[in-house]
């Protein structure tokens, strides 16, 4: 058993660590609230872009937009959004396990895989995989938002260009979904083709409305250019929204991880204090025994 001085030193060390984790919990909570506001602000834009694409597509049903129609899948692409920093529990590893399962299924079906990674954790993880081809990387830095946005936009454009050129036939995005402060879960959604924005009922209704002249648009450019640009903006907005949502997940997970660390530190301190009291009790008992032995000898 350690002596009393060593135990006191350990208690002080754990208390210092507890102060750090407590401060990190407060910082993460503050950042999480800001991230949630940003996440909620971008959603109306994505929803509006979705509605516009529906209306424009319905008004031009004769144009076979390449972003809206499915095709035979020979190669797929993934945009994986992770964090740049750690200390956020199992947030990243749970996401990687989820997307890796899908990637392995594609590889078993002899479907090629290209990956665009956003975040250093995803970059480090997928760089170790032999059967996965990383075609683009990007990072999001709060201190250089404009530079980060340009880098992410460039990485996403690489995947869009590969889809347009027919090098990949389907594009997915893997990120974390913010359910609540204490719950975040991995999510895999299809970015391209974006035909999923229409249900069968909507397609039928849109065709009827278009036939009746319900929407009558006048375009400054060709409908092809307008619709293609809208689809690209829609995809970019989805990725942007996913990055902001993933940031909220990161701060929520870090807040909970630091809270658990702070609580565990309290338990460790209590146990160390118990050990300290046992050591002191043993020392006092030994001293009393020595005193009694000395008195008996006299």
UniProtKB/Swiss-Prot annotation:
It is found in: Cell inner membrane. It comes from the Bacteria. GO terms for molecular function: ATP binding; proton-transporting ATP synthase activity, rotational mechanism. SUPFAM superfamilies: ATP synthase (F1-ATPase), gamma subunit (SSF52943). GO terms for biological process: proton motive force-driven plasma membrane ATP synthesis. The keyword Ion transport applies. Disulfide bonds: none annotated. GO terms for cellular component: plasma membrane; proton-transporting ATP synthase complex. F-type ATPases have 2 components, CF(1) - the catalytic core - and CF(0) - the membrane proton channel. CF(1) has five subunits: alpha(3), beta(3), gamma(1), delta(1), epsilon(1). CF(0) has three main subunits: a, b and c. This is ATP synthase gamma chain.
């Amino acid at each position: 058993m350690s002596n009393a001085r060593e135990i006191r030193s350990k208690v002080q060390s754990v208390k210092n660590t507890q102060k750090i984790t407590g401060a990190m919990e407060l910082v993460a909570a503050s950042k999480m609230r800001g991230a949630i506001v940003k996440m909620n602000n971008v959603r109306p834009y994505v929803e509006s872009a979705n509605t516009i694409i529906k209306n424009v597509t319905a008004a031009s049903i004769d144009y076979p937009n390449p972003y809206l129609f499915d095709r035979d899948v020979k190669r797929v692409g993934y945009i994986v959004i992770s964090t740049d920093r750690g200390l956020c529990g199992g947030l990243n590893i749970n996401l990687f396990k989820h997307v890796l399962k899908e990637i392995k299924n594609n590889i078993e079906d002899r479907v090629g895989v290209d990956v665009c990674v956003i975040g250093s954790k995803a970059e480090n993880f997928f760089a170790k995989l032999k059967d996965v081809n990383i075609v683009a990387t990007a990072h999001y830095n709060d201190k250089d938002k404009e530079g980060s946005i340009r880098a992410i936009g460039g990485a996403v454009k690489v995947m869009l260009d590969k889809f347009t050129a027919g090098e990949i036939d389907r594009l997915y995005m893997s990120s974390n979904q913010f359910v609540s402060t204490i719950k975040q879960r991995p999510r895999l959604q299809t970015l391209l083709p974006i035909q999923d924005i229409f249900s069968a009922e909507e397609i039928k209704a849109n065709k009827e409305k278009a036939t009746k002249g319900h929407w009558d648009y006048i375009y400054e450019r060709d409908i092809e250019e307008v619709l293609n640009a809208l689809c690209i903006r829609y995809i970019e907005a989805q990725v942007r929204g996913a990055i902001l949502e993933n940031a909220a997940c990161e701060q929520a997970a870090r807040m909970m991880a630091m809270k658990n660390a702070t609580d565990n530190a309290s338990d460790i301190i209590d146990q160390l204090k118990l050990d300290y009291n046992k050591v002191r009790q043993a020392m006092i008992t030994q001293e009393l025994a020595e005193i009694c032995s000395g008195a008996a000898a006299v």
